[in-house]
Amino acid sequence: MEEWRIQDRMSQLADVLEAPEEHGVGSVNGLVDMLQLDLGVMVRLDADARPLLSAMKKVLTAGEMSGLDYSGLLSLLDTVVKLAPFETVLEVFSVEDIITALESDDQLVRTSCKVLAVSHPKDLFSTTRIMDVLLQLYFSQRTVPVNAVEDVFQSLCTDGLIRRRILENNYPLLREMRSTHDAILFSRYLVLMTILFRHIDRSEFQKELFVPTTEEVLDSLKKDIFLFINVAKYYRALLEYATDPGAAGGPRDWALSYILPVLHAFGHIYENKEKYIEVHSYARAYLFQLLRTVSYLEDMEVFRELDVKYLHISGDNPDVMHFMAIFNPMYLYRHHFDLLTSQVTVKPSFLPVLKNIVSCQETFEILKPALTASAILIMPYSEQMVLLGQLSSYPHSTEYLVQELPKVMSNLICNENGPISEPETIELRKKVFENLLLYSATVLNVWYEPLLDEYTNICSGKTSFVRTEVVDMYL
């Protein structure tokens, strides 16, 4: 859209916002929506945004106006401050304005957080009281727009000076929250520590702030089951960020020596699940997801120790099917080979396990003898598509599918089960085609053209037709 039109629309809205009662809230809401649409396709805003920002600030800091779409106005503010030069934004929203807003009602807190989240450079407010006030607000007993505050942390904690302001200048507050008995405030503390851990270097790491002890993990169960869930999620995040090679600054494996010993607390909780009944009822999935993350650590001996001491993976464990569906298949291959060979079967109830086994080339070799056309085609069609979606996701299993399972490929292309009415199954089948067509014509061989033709039919909504010449040739 032409710049002059944007400027005209912004000026028009600014004028209306100066006297919203005179023009009516319907007119204001309509102009806000139109400008939001106009700005939605822009990557920067060269027009002078100061009059509009000033008018928006005036309305947002005034008393609440009946019928005004404050959500839409805040969304527009978010868009404008992201597109406009930040020095322009600061001409309207001063440091004191932001602090005053943070100490006001929720609407003004959201307004100031919109501005803070896009501040440039990110360390701009590191020498002011803004982060101190924001932390006091975040850890206060009053109801606050938590997501808006956390958006600021997510944006600004990438900067070292901001992190220093939080970790050093506000150390007493963090220590207080570290030992609080308030489940809600401690959960917020864990969120903040998760955000910080993603970006800190070794010199910033403080064990007493970042690593809850074994006793604290066990105590969280006594306080609140949902607090325990947040602790389990926190430890999972620590492990993921500590071992992520793509993380900013590289993996933080130097933190593992502090994190790993505490994992025994979670193993103990699993082993004593009859004692911790609430875990089985409400937190089982979160505990298992944490254990799954441990199973994928490069040093498999960490998980092996938990397995031997607490998990006892075997055919006698009532959770064995769940374990086989989520734990690192390479770990299962190395330490529970006999379990895999004795338990693997191709049937709908085993589908979660099959998906996990297919993902690893070594465990897929164990599955091959059972992965026959008759075993697959006897499954309900939607389950067939789930399995084929997984088979078509990896080169080793795709090769087996296209070379060794012609009846399955034929059934996929010709849709011999008849018309599909369930939208989910239609999407699953379409995804299988998309997965397969990522491979070259050389890999797909005679199936390439039939797959491409049928995928075209799917996308255009045409009726499928049987390519008998391909089926007859390959069967």
Swiss-Prot record:
Q: Which cysteines are joined by disulfide bonds?
A: none
Task: Give any GO molecular function from the UniProt entry.
Answer: protein folding chaperone
Keywords for this protein? Chaperone, Cytoplasm, DNA damage, DNA repair
Q: Lineage, please?
A: Eukaryota, Fungi, Dikarya, Ascomycota, Saccharomycotina
GO CC annotation terms, alphabetical = cytosol; nucleus
Q: Which InterPro entries match?
A: HSM3_C, HSM3_N
Where is the protein situated, by its record's location annotation? Answer: Cytoplasm
Q: Which GO terms describe its biological process?
A: mismatch repair; proteasome regulatory particle assembly
Concerning CDD domains, the annotation shows: Hsm3_like (cd12794)
Q: Report any Pfam family annotated for this entry.
A: HSM3_N
Family classification = Belongs to the proteasome subunit S5B/HSM3 family.
Q: Which organism is it from?
A: Eremothecium gossypii (strain ATCC 10895 / CBS 109.51 / FGSC 9923 / NRRL Y-1056)
What name does UniProt use for this protein?
A: DNA mismatch repair protein HSM3
Name the job this protein performs. Answer: Involved in DNA mismatch repair in slow-growing cells. Acts as a chaperone during the assembly of the 26S proteasome, specifically of the base subcomplex of the 19S regulatory complex (RC).
Q: What is its main location?
A: cytoplasm
This protein's encoding gene: HSM3
